[in-house]
Amino acid sequence: MNTKALFPGSFDPFTAGHLNILKRALTMFDEVIVAVGINQDKRGFFDMDQRIDIIRQAVKGLNGVSIIKYDNLTIDTCHEYGIHHMVRGVRNMIDFETERSIADANRKLAPDVETIIIPTAQEFAHISSSAVRVFLKLHGESSFFLPEGVILPETR
């Protein structure tokens, strides 16, 4: 049986912490679809094509990973792809409480989709996409937050 999970996020950009969660999800599922969300109300630091390119660089050599973009409810994307598991990563208890609330709401909308919350490994707990963006704006150096081998594109 081929088990699939959706790993949704804005991934602006995809970090070493995201990769840690993805690799751990791949030990539980045959396929993990990284779903890059489009938020019409937010202007991303990196555009959609750049974010997808960063993820492609990060997952190079990993089997069972595909990348999509979506602009509807995450639950609707799960149904569109026949997925019954959604993976979410958390760094700390604040993240956990937020994700648990979202999972509860999603369960009401779609009881057939289960949210799997994976705590990031401790060495990645300090990493966030927001921190990467701050470092890029202020210092220009953020490689220590990124998956090995990822080269960030020029930003707008």
Where are the predicted features?
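Nucleotidyltransferase catalytic core that binds NTPs
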Residues: 1-156
